[in-house]
């Protein structure tokens, strides 16, 4: 029910959403959610995550892939499955994206199928490249020039390397955007917006408390999931309509209200909102005005270190799966 409500909500508010250069900008990423261990959930094939050949985590896991509108802060679409396959989920979601849209991906997603799907749908992509990317794109790793244009299965793609001035290291990207937009400054600013999907996932788990499920049946879990998305979008749209238009969307300085306070008020009075009682919108506007503050995005100034953390699935929290 709430999945349909979410899609209806998106269509209803489409004209209110803001764009960049006439493009809706989305970011796709994945999230792992812990489910309660019940017979109904196990029967629906939601099992623990594999930690070795014969062992898995005790609690069942749901693998969620979501597309977030990073300019407006709302959930565009999502897929959930018992197994981890973010690339297949992304390919499926791209089919519903607008022609005038740009989707940003991290290093996991770059593959031929996703490139061809974007080409079929006539929309744009921006991939960050990993060292083991397809052979045609590895040219940029050795090339002396900053930008290079190639073709992958008939699709024209612009490759570019962007230098981090603080670490003096290069990051590599691939995009089918018009070549006038494939510049170091633009690509860096665009990719920095991908962090908004990580912030949204933090809100899902820390503010909305998605993993504190009320139901122990998979249908109830799915209803709670899509209800959370609907409420999240409702709050973000209220904030979007109240805050003034931003001239430079990629500026380090921005204004933001207290999302947790606004979400808690709306979720506590949800039935009053559904009945459209008078005066509630004024309260939301007042909360937004009172809690909005100027903030600054801080970039990482040190070299990234990838360490080997302690396993999130200690032996005592796993079970045999033979």
Put a short name on every predicted segment.
Residues 1-6, 17-24, 31, 35-41, ...:
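Single, function-defining residue in the core of a domain
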Residues 7-13:
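A short, well-structured juxtamembrane/interface segment
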């Amino acid at each position: 029910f709430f999945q349909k409500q979410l899609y209806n909500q998106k269509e209803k508010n489409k004209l209110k959403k803001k764009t960049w250069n006439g493009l809706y900008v989305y970011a796709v990423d994945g999230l792992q959610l812990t489910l309660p261990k019940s017979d109904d959930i196990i029967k629906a094939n939601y099992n623990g995550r594999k930690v070795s050949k014969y062992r898995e985590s005790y609690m069942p896991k749901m693998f969620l892939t979501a597309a977030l509108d990073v300019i407006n802060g709302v959930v565009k679409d999502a897929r959930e499955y018992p197994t981890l396959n973010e690339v297949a989920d992304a390919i499926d979601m791209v089919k519903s994206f607008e022609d005038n849209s740009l989707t940003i991906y991290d290093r996991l997603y770059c593959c031929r199928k996703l490139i061809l799907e974007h080409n079929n749908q006539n929309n744009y992509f921006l991939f960050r490249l990993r060292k083991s990317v397809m052979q045609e794109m590895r040219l940029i790793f050795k090339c002396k020039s900053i930008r290079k244009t190639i073709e992958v299965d008939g699709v024209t793609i612009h490759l570019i390397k962007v230098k981090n001035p603080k670490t003096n290291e290069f990051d590599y990207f691939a995009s089918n955007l018009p070549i006038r937009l494939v510049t170091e400054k633009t690509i860096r600013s665009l990719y920095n917006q991908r962090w908004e999907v990580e912030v949204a996932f933090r809100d899902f788990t820390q503010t909305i408390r998605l993993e504190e499920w009320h139901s122990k049946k998979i249908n109830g879990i799915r209803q709670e999931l899509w209800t959370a998305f609907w409420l999240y979008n409702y709050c973000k749209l209220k904030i979007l309509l109240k805050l003034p238009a931003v001239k430079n969307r990629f500026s380090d300085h921005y204004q933001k209200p207290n999302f947790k306070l606004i979400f808690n008020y709306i979720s506590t009075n949800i039935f009053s909102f559904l009945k459209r009682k008078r005066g509630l919108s004024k309260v939301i506007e007042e909360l937004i005005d009172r809690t909005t503050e100027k903030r600054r995005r801080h970039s990482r100034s040190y070299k990234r270190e990838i360490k080997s953390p302690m396993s999130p699935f200690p032996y005592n929290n796993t079970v045999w799966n033979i």
